[in-house]
Amino acid sequence: MNILNRLGLGSSGQTNMDPSPIAQGNDDDTPAPGNQFAQFGAGCFWGVELAFQRVPGVTQTEAGYTQGTVDNPSYGDVCSGTTGHSEVVRVQYDLNDCTYESLLDLFWSRHDPTTLNRQGNDVGTQYRSGIYFYTPEQEKLARESLERHQQQMERKIMTEILPAKKFYRAEEHHQQYLSKGGRFGQGQSTAKGCNDPIRCYG
């Protein structure tokens, strides 16, 4: 997804890389009543977001950036590799209709967690594997899930599990990118429970 030249996007020129207290603070947004947030980094957020859109009980998804040192980064800033941000999807889910465990299962199935700072052809720290938790229960479930999956893997899982930090919503162009048609204008289904293969194209 590193296609800055094709999209006409680049670094905003932000040179002050002193850690921002805002960027390193907690995510202070509030989910809807009866809902909870979760954050996952699993490579390019386009395909990851579509996968979570299809989960029954997921009420909202947003592509964005987190875990960095710069306040309000642009896509260009993040792709420069100098801000420390990860591309993530923030998922809002109904606690009565969706379990955190089901979100974790989808997370593991969507990417190779044994590659460091890379998913397929996408290379950079922004593509690292990460689970960013909002509650002690989420942390507990995430760590238990990692341990179970590690037993099934020959290579070491590189996924980081950290507290959720400030979430920066990505530019509108990136939101629900594949369901809106992507580069070729061919929208992909967001129907709940849909198992159609996800085609990620820029």
From Swiss-Prot:
It catalyses: L-methionyl-[protein] + [thioredoxin]-disulfide + H2O = L-methionyl-(S)-S-oxide-[protein] + [thioredoxin]-dithiol; [thioredoxin]-disulfide + L-methionine + H2O = L-methionine (S)-S-oxide + [thioredoxin]-dithiol. The keyword Hydrolase does not apply. GO terms for biological process: response to light stimulus. Residues 1-34 are annotated as: Disordered. Belongs to the MsrA Met sulfoxide reductase family. PANTHER family: MITOCHONDRIAL PEPTIDE METHIONINE SULFOXIDE REDUCTASE, PEPTIDE METHIONINE SULFOXIDE REDUCTASE A3. This is Peptide methionine sulfoxide reductase A3. It comes from Arabidopsis thaliana (Mouse-ear cress). The lineage of its organism: Eukaryota, Viridiplantae, Streptophyta, Embryophyta, Tracheophyta. The gene is MSRA3.
